Amino acid sequence: MADEGSSTKDSESFSVLNWDQVSRLHEVLTEVVPIHGRGNFPTLEITLKDIVQTVRSRLEEAGIKVQDVRLNGSAAGHVLVKDNGLGCKDLDLIFHVALPTEAEFQLVRDVVLCSLLNFLPEGVNKLKISPVTLKEAYVQKLVKVCTDTDRWSLISLSNKNGRNVELKFVDSIRRQFEFSVDSFQIILDSLLFFYDCSSNPVSEHFHPTVVGESMYGDFEEAFDHLQNRLIATKNPEEIRGGGLLKYSNLLVRDFRPADQEEIKTLERYMCSRFFIDFPDILEQQRKLETYLQNHFADEERSKYDYLMILRRVVNESTVCLMGHERRQTLNLISLLALRVLAEQNIIPSATNVTCYYQPAPYVSDGNFNNYYIAHPPVTYSQPYPTWLPCN
């Protein structure tokens, strides 16, 4: 009986795609995506179909068996529900492979870099281009994770419009999603086999069976959340620090919590994890700036709204910080928001804007002087210490 229950539970996480969904998947896989080179390196014109087939065949030639290949992230969500509010920015591909030693990690990296040679324009002397050169020219991000629960690597190919092609090679990973709406993976093997073996084009009456999986566990429930723009998750304590940024991104796109009572607990978990993973203010700034660049490349108008939502969540749900640390992060978010407005010429200059923040509790003390008068800097001819003793 236990086996039957487990089998039923597993089957709930899978669903067969209909023709409209297969058609959108075909469009995503065959769309030409530019990979922009740094410096004088030419732009590579690739399709996901071609890069997957090239990398997969080269991996298997090198002795690394690919268990399956999947489309992940917002691209998978776009295939399932076209106008879902998330768009189709990320082009994430997952290759399930065995990575028992460092040698396999290195081999995977070399295979991907050498595969890029296939996409260089005609006339380029490929013999003089090394894998290291290709990495410097076309790779936006290179990640390797080796822990007791996670063994995977990521190679992100650069696109100036934020549509990076991300190739993820996974041996094991503890958690593959943050919220139900980003938990979908579409297994590509049947369609890739069709491309290789069929002389007929994909059509409504002649296409392979394609299966999707929700890592959330219940495909229909997650699909309903995606259709109706609902925010839900499982085991929120496992969500990494970036979950707070993704949650705020969902809110700015008019997603709403599926359960209003649980959302405050979820927000507190995410705020705590964000400050655990990014304890330093400079780390927080880098993370926020990178997130804005990657997820709002063509949505300048949404950046300010996003930062204000993030600020509200941090202000209301942060319980793990000293007061000054919390205020420091809130001020960082406010300054980033002002910079966004200045870049959009909505205000003339961020330096001419006064920031107001909620006073600390000790301001209510009658002996506390709540006025600080800023004087213009004075130039001294002799060296003068930059610190003053505290009274």
From Swiss-Prot:
**Subcellular localization, as worded in the UniProt entry:** Nucleus; Cytoplasm; Cytoplasm, Cytoskeleton, Microtubule organizing center, Centrosome
**Keyword RNA-binding attached:** yes
Q: Does the keyword Plastid apply?
A: no
Reactions it catalyzes: RNA(n) + ATP = RNA(n)-3'-adenine ribonucleotide + diphosphate
Q: What is the main EC category here?
A: transferase
The entry lists its GO molecular-function terms as: poly(A) RNA polymerase activity; RNA binding
Cite the EC number: 2.7.7.19
Q: Which UniProt keywords apply?
A: Cytoplasm, Cytoskeleton, Nucleotidyltransferase, Nucleus, RNA-binding, Transferase
Q: SMART domains this protein is in?
A: DUF1693
The principal location of this protein is nucleus
Mind listing the GO biological process terms from this record? in utero embryonic development; mRNA stabilization; negative regulation of cell differentiation
Coiled-coil residues: none
User: Which Gene Ontology CC terms are recorded?
Assistant: centrosome; cytoplasm; nucleoplasm; nucleus
Q: What is the documented function of this protein?
A: Catalyzes the transfer of one adenosine molecule from an ATP to an mRNA poly(A) tail bearing a 3'-OH terminal group and enhances mRNA stability and gene expression. Can also elongate RNA oligos ending with uridine molecule, provided that the sequence is adenosine-rich. Mainly targets mRNAs encoding endoplasmic reticulum-targeted protein.
Q: How does it assemble?
A: Interacts with BCCIP and PABPC1; the interaction has no effect on TENT5C poly(A) polymerase function. Interacts with PLK4; this interaction leads to the TENT5C recruitment into the centrosome.
- Provide the family line: Belongs to the TENT family.
Q: What is this protein called?
A: Terminal nucleotidyltransferase 5C
The organism is: Rattus norvegicus (Rat)
| Name of the coding gene | Tent5c
